[in-house]
Amino acid sequence: MRNKILLFLLTFIGISQIAAASSVRDKYNFNSEWLLYVGDIPEAKEVRFQDTDWKKVTLPRPFNEDEAFRLSIEQLTDTVMWYRKHFRLPADSKNKKVFVEFEGVRQGADFYINGEYIGLHENGAMAVGFDLTPYIKYGQENVMAVRIDNNWNYKERATGTKYQWSDRNFNANYGGIPKNVWLHVTDKLYQTLPLYSNLKTTGVYIYAEDIRVKSRKAVVHAESEIKNEYNRDKKVAYKVEVFDRDGKSIKSFEGTQTVVKPGETATLEASAEIDGLHFWSWGYGYLYTVKTSLWVDGRKVDEVATRTGFRKTRFGKGMIWLNDRVIQMKGFAQRTSNEWPGVGMSVPAWLSDYSNGLMVEDNANLVRWMHITPWKQDIESCDRVGLIQAMQAGDA
């Protein structure tokens, strides 16, 4: 009996099993059970390609991360590599939308799903997303394959232009998939993802205005870009609920109902004054969770949770003001790769908090990310530890 149980378990090793949807929107960590091969095999895009001898890795995992601090950055290996992942989606996801989000690949990548080419991403730093819905085999095995070239001298195919910031003497080249990957499953009426690269969508935007620091009040705005992929009109109610750091609901409000036509993209808005606010500040990373939801005929069909803080800033008389107080800016310039020995830039979130928290402990209130955008994890980390971030325009 023991051998039969072991055989049953081994049958499922190597194929990610994604559980049935448990809410109106599901976001799955898509980092586990990838396969990596260093070298170029054009046939690796095919579904039936034999990858059983490839290296098993968990993302984020650049192929050359173990070279970090062992080699000088100008000596980091650059080559072509392939990543593949086998996964299944439950059959009851068939009438849903499925998106994949890569927080970043370096330098250029070709993406395939079930042998079909779905797109090219040439950036090296920023996130990209793809709509997998037309290609998914529900209840069956699916294969995603990604061919990546991290050549130091990589040039855009359309223009023959090099990346301005890709320099052997500066920006450490950890090639492949050095950042997280997520799978999103939504209703066909949904709030878009903030993935302008390829998807051309902007997602949810939460901000505050009319901030009154002394009375701890502000008007909080929520905006969601939504899309209706049903074949009929949808009358949509837009609701917003704000939760404090401890998870307590402090305000609920909603916008006017809107009719969204089939295939139409629209922006829904709502705002309300909130009192008793804690304002985000240096060393005080107070964050709220704002849930924006879509309702049709009294039923919630989509919900997105956004973590954010509220602060008041002003520039005048040669000074910077934060929450109505003058603040002298001082801090560090940090390479966006921000690497650690043996793992490169692909560190867990707690290590990002430790690294960024050290700057706050050292009396810094500002980090200037150098030349290219940092990854999402560092942005969120600085929000948590209370560190102001700056990145110069025109160099990203």
Residue ranges of model-derived segments:
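Active-site mouth of glycoside hydrolases
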Residues: 125-129, 138, 155, 164, ...
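Short acidic/polar inter-strand loop motif in beta-rich domains
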Residues: 149-156, 295-301, 324
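Bacterial Sec-dependent N-terminal signal peptides
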Residues: 1-24
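Accessory beta-strand-rich segments of carbohydrate-active enzymes
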Residues: 28-30, 40, 78-200, 230, ...
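Conserved, mostly hydrophobic/aromatic
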Residues: 34, 115, 181, 224, ...
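Beta-strand-rich binding/interaction modules
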Residues: 113, 215-258, 266-268
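Signal that preferentially marks extracellular ectodomain short beta-strand elements
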Residues: 130-135, 269-285
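Surface beta-strand/loop "capping" patches
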Residues: 188-230
